Amino acid sequence: MRAEQHLEASFRAVLKNMNLPWPDKAVIEPSKDPKHGDLASNLALVSAKAAGMPPRELAAKMAEALRNEDTSLASVEVAGPGFLNVTFSPEFWRETIRRIDDAADRFGQATVGKGCKVQVEYVSANPTGPLHIGHGRGAAVGDTLARILRFAGYDVTTEYYINDAGRQMRLLGLSIWLRAKELAGIAVEWPEDYYRGSYIIDIAREMMDKDPGLTSLSDAEGQDRCFAYGMQTILDGIKEDLREFRVEHQVWFSERSLVEHGAVEETFERLKKAGLSFEKDGALWFRTTDFGDDKDRVLRKSDGSLTYFASDIAYHDDKYRRGFDRVVDVWGADHHGYVPRMKAAVQAVGRKAEDLDVVLIQLVNLLENGTQVAMSTRAGQFETLADVVKEVGVDAARFMFLSRKSDSHLDFDLALVKQRSMDNPVYYVQYAHARVRSVLRKAAEAGLTLPEKTDLALLVPLSEAEDLALLHFLDRFEDVAKGAAQALAPHHISYYLM
């Protein structure tokens, strides 16, 4: 049993014998100073009024009761105005090893998510180019978060939303089409915002190699063909990059399918019937202000084209229709202003605002020896996720992406990540693991074998302060894993390891 859980059970027994209720404001937490014990509690302070006695007097009675009834405690002391400082016996901490041994890979698993279906949508980059390092951070956070939630008992489905409709996709088709015409020696006029990446030229050349007569098509047909081929080529590349990064989405959901199957229009009709939409200036608007947004939002523009928001409402409605109790979206921090309107949309389709969680991912600054690397595709400069993974490896890249809170800016120093020094958090953790494996290897070479089951008698020498501190640290993992799931904060695991 976890130390906090064990102590709470003992405290509850003491209160029951005193005919006192468990107070809502009771806290049991690790002591700020190890000299003052393993755990500290304010139980006497928050129970004094109900007991009708001064906090220190009540604390003294509780301490005496604990000393007499709980043999796993080495000491219980009263401090300050009535705090209780508790130190567990070495035997209690050594029992932690038995629990870890018995649970094996399941050690730390929780059941807080049992019976709850969660969808985690992450990355969802427009298929207009290869994934960059910002997408890599989102991939690492989303994938790790899904793993943590599963570990906590949630039924998790991971999903990638393919933005294959709208202006950006039309622009992709146009960019490839113009490059193809240029390769054919046809003069073209370039729009200001076309896609300039060298990958566009590669796709156009590939299409021309397969179909030399491509540019004889009409502009409309040529752009459509270039869009379809280009999007699929880029999407295949994205999937391959994610596989190399050990990220596998269970579902790939097409935005275009929402439009083609009438889901967007159906959503419009529902909003209209609920009195949550209105026409103004030839456009269709959603009354998001009814749900606390700072202004109403356009769903369909005056030219008849749909906004991204329109598709996003239909998409989130579809998520809940598929039976998910909770939806987690992992977005770039530049979408922070989008959160209130999506919360409004979720409520408009009949869900609670808290049924949608949004994890924001801040920018990644790529550095080389402390100097920022320009984000371009020129030779020798790293921009894409594939480039970074090739340079430092999957493990190092994933760990670095998770080494800070997701909503904090991250400096990713390529030189530091490759350093074999304690300044490199990746090396620090890997080195600790290597040392442990080395101890086990040398023990085997010396003919020492570990018993199949933990023999507590063999652990008696583990009584030094450093030994007990390590056991206490291992005991904390259950709370760390559970807390990471509840807070949607994968970095809690990284911090624990560091």
Task: Label every model-predicted segment.
Residues 1-94, 105, 109-498:
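Non-catalytic interaction-recognition regions
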